[in-house]
Amino acid sequence: MQNKIDHKNIKKIGLVTRPNVSLDKEILKLQSILSIYKVELVLFKESSEILDLPKYGLDDLFKISDFVISLGGDGTLISLCRKACEYDKAVLGIHAGHLGFLTDFKVDEAENFFQAFFQGEFRIEKPYLLSVFLEDKQGKILEKLAFNDVVISKNNQAPMAHIEVFRKEKKFNEYFGDGLIVATPAGSTAYNLSANGPIVYTLAQAFILTPVCSHSLTQRSIVLPKGFEIEIMAKDCILCIDGQENYKMNDFKSIKVGLSDKNVALIHPKNRDYFQILKEKLHWGN
């Protein structure tokens, strides 16, 4: 993953917006700002039906762009980050949605950001993703990435989930309840937090297992290091990646999860303070 961006030689910036919402006004404002720096704004083909701007499929957009803007909420950014890993491209999150824990600022603040950006005043953070290996009954392995979390939950027919977790073929825990969350540090402030899981610093090389509504008072979250791969077995359960992709666990004979070697470069304002964000979003202190 790239460690830096050559801000002096940016030619094209891609833009992907929150789906099913018209953000043409915001797009035009960003285009106007970027034109000052002689940078072309190019769109994902589904981001606008009206605007007469160059439009591309998602793969082509990543290929031609120096980096890509996510204009929406956290969900838009999360799905884009998984794609960015394929092309080794950075992502900038601009808020225009419901949830904004990961996005740093709104379009109204973009002029100040880009003024600083093109002077080299920005920072890049590279949180790690989860690798998920799904092996079907024929032995074919599908690898997926998760930015926030992988959630195993009971289906509608099961009274509760029975989930077994192994490491190197040795069982180290068994969960009875509504499900199990496997979260990245970046995802520790999402579903994991609402299930009383711990907050883990975004750039930590670790991941979290958090039971959901466990039927045992002794079951608690556990933080595991990079290099620790787990195998999860559960019947009549659904595996969900980042709240966006669902798989029936009965369709697979093996599911393994661990912290990936892949990370994604997120562009932030230089003065971004992770702990200040926690304080504001979670209403810590005064």
UniProtKB/Swiss-Prot annotation:
**Its gene?**
nadK
Q: Where is the active site?
A: D74
Query: Do you know which InterPro entries this protein is assigned to?
Result: ATP-NAD_kinase_N, ATP-NAD_kinase_PpnK-typ_C, NAD/diacylglycerol_kinase_sf, NADK
Q: Which residues bind NAD(+)?
A: D74, G75, N148, D149, D178, A186, T189, A190, Y191, N192, L193, S194, Q244
Name of protein: NAD kinase
- Organism in which the protein naturally occurs: Campylobacter jejuni subsp. doylei (strain ATCC BAA-1458 / RM4099 / 269.97)
Reactions performed catalytically: NAD(+) + ATP = ADP + NADP(+) + H(+)
SUPFAM superfamilies this protein is in? NAD kinase/diacylglycerol kinase-like
Q: Per its Swiss-Prot or TrEMBL entry, what cofactor is needed? A: a divalent metal cation
* PANTHER family registered for this protein in UniProt: NAD KINASE
Q: What is its main location?
A: cytoplasm
Gene Ontology CC entries for this record: cytoplasm
Family of this protein: Belongs to the NAD kinase family.
User: What keywords are assigned to this protein?
Assistant: ATP-binding, Cytoplasm, Kinase, NAD, NADP, Nucleotide-binding, Transferase
Summary of the function given for this chain in its UniProt record: Involved in the regulation of the intracellular balance of NAD and NADP, and is a key enzyme in the biosynthesis of NADP. Catalyzes specifically the phosphorylation on 2'-hydroxyl of the adenosine moiety of NAD to yield NADP.
The superkingdom listed in its UniProt entry is Bacteria
User: Which GO terms of type biological process are on file?
Assistant: NAD metabolic process; NADP biosynthetic process
Which Pfam families does the entry link to? NAD_kinase, NAD_kinase_C
Give the E.C. number(s). 2.7.1.23
Q: Which GO terms describe its molecular function?
A: ATP binding; metal ion binding; NAD binding; NAD+ kinase activity
Q: Where in the cell is it found?
A: Cytoplasm
